[in-house]
A protein has these predicted regions:
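Secondary-structure boundary elements
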Residues: 130-218
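Flexible helix-coil transition and linker loops at the boundaries of alpha-helical arrays
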Residues: 1-2, 37-55
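Low-complexity, Gly/Ser/Thr/Pro-rich intrinsically disordered linker/tail segments
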Residues: 296-382
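"A position-specific structural signal for the A-helix of alpha-solenoid helical repeats
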Residues: 13, 64, 98-101
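Hydrophobic/aromatic-rich core segments of domains that either
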Residues: 225-299
């Protein structure tokens, strides 16, 4: 694996420097070498790198190769490389449509056909063409709650509450202000790093202390799990929700929190990674289900002004909701039991612990996980 990484890094650095300096003819050699390297590698069989990630990287390299050929005036080779890029899943429509490196191809019918394929992969397009939900009469009539919420009086949640002094953090204001204060607290205290999964116990205290001791961040799952425990410790029902894309080869998802508001009588969309919540045009906070529905039907959505990544990058509605979250709101997964340390490293994972909300006809990779097509069942009042 080390040899592969060193070779890949070497040729990647070469071609990027050559492209940056306008030496597109010379950049073709390291680019084709990289494509060949990914074509023949079996590294996904002996490392945590998913095969889908290799294919995605190959699509990006082929796209850059197409740009080089187009700038050199080699139209046939450019279109062939672009076709292979699209076959391997290239999906950045805005980049492809506006990239001046490809301007010599724009009137070509083959280019236009490839661009149309990429447009169909845009997250908002996929979401708007998803199948509808359907009533799940069996579970509705069952009467048993799908989800359980650990009471705040439990010893572990009491420890969380006292450790972080959460009564003081939440404040004495109304319910919504308390929910938002806890969001800000988690966002400020636990840094995000999407590429790092801290190998600690999966509870708010251990995760916080890991960040404090190492100066490192944690992934969105560990952040959302931590904030979920904080809400539960104050008696506010909450779940951390894995928001999933439609594409089974897309290994990137996002995890946020659904927090119950007794005042609004609904689950609220709360994202500790981005310090974010979403409102309608009247300023009313929305649920995850409402955000999804409004994206599908192109209704107004307002992202809170505080939305940011690690206090470094402000978030916009267009980038965060229209692009990123529209990809990750295709289906949802929640834990059946919402509690302290819900994913302990010392417990074996059991797919029966999870419940999914999926569109009609969609079958996810986790076929052993219980699923429903009924949002009323999945988002039932706690």
């Amino acid at each position: 694996m080390m040899e592969f990484q060193e070779m890949f890094s070497k040729y990647q650095t070469q071609y990027r420097q050559l492209m940056k300096s306008g030496q597109h003819k010379d950049a073709v050699v390291p680019l084709t070498t990289l494509v060949s390297l990914l074509d023949t590698t079996t590294i996904h069989q002996v490392s945590p790198i998913p095969e889908a990630a290799i294919r995605e990287q190959k699509a990006l390299l082929l796209y850059d190769l197409a740009c080089c050929y187009a700038l050199l005036g080699h139209k046939r080779q450019a279109l062939l490389a672009l076709e292979h890029s699209v076959e391997d899943g290239y999906k950045d429509y805005n980049n492809m449509a506006n990239d001046n490196d490809l301007r010599s191809l724009r009137k070509d019918k083959k280019y236009q056909s490839l661009l149309a394929q990429v447009q169909g992969r845009q997250p908002i397009h996929v979401l708007r063409h998803s199948a509808p939900y359907a009533r799940d009469a069996e579970r509705l009539n069952d009467g048993k709650p799908l989800f359980i919420y650990q009471p705040k009086e439990s010893m572990n949640l009491r420890v969380v509450r006292e450790y972080f002094n959460l009564d003081s953090v939440a404040g004495t204001g109304d319910e919504l202000s308390r929910i938002i204060n806890l969001l800000h607290f988690a966002h400020d205290k636990i840094r995000h790093d999407g590429g790092n999964r801290a190998f600690v116990e999966m509870d708010a205290i251990d995760i916080y202390n890991y960040c404090k001791a190492t100066g490192k961040g944690v992934n969105c799952r560990q952040l959302a799990l931590s904030l979920c425990e904080m809400y539960l410790s104050l008696g506010i029902p909450a779940r951390y929700v894995t928001c999933m894309p439609a594409d089974p080869n897309d290994y990137e998802c996002h995890v946020i929190d659904a927090v119950w508001s007794s005042e609004l009588q609904k689950w609220l969309y709360i994202d500790p990674t981005m310090d974010a919540w979403v409102t309608d045009e009247n300023g009313t906070m929305l649920s995850i289900a409402e955000v999804r529905e409004r994206l599908i039907n192109d209704k107004p959505l307002l992202l809170c002004e505080t939305a940011n990544w690690n206090h470094e990058t402000p978030q916009t509605k267009e980038n965060y909701l229209d692009n990123y979250m529209s990809k990750n709101l295709y289906y949802f997964v929640c834990k059946r039991v919402n509690r302290f340390n819900a994913e302990s490293m010392y417990r074996d994972y059991d797919p029966r612990d999870d419940i999914q909300l999926v569109p009609v006809g969609y079958v996810s990779e986790s076929q052993h996980c219980e699923a429903t097509t009924d949002p009323d069942v999945f988002w039932a009042k706690p």
